[in-house]
Amino acid sequence: MSMWEMVLALFAVVLFTSISLGYNQALWRQTDYLNNATLVVQANHICHSVLDEIDAKMFSKDLNFLNIVSMFHDSTRVVYYPHLQQSFTVKIAAINSDSLGHSLPNPNSIFKTVSVTVSGPSALKHNVSLKRIYTKTNM
């Protein structure tokens, strides 16, 4: 094998390695995006289920409007999903608020804001947070 053929073989190896490395990095990045999207959807579902639980308790009269803050202020839950083999931390914060969701010192306001924040495994890049403003309807 001549020197020219060895140089061509070396260039072929370098070219093939760089192409396969670029492809593998793109595949890894897409897999990471897909895992993050799956966990964001799951975290969003957890937020909605907590807020829907509060709605159901209020609708069935198991929860009084004035007790929302005392029951859900700074509470934390851990939810484990065996099919994902992941656990999520759910933080619930309830405050007395105005119609825009800004905090008020008055405990008898007609608006309550409940914020649910879900944090999870490292594949979930950012915490997912949802807010709902509840209004006292029977004055």
What residues fall within each predicted segment?
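Aliphatic-rich helix starts adjacent to a transmembrane/signal segment
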Residues: 1-48
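Low-complexity, Gly/Pro-rich coil/beta segments used as flexible assembly/activation regions
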Residues: 36-139
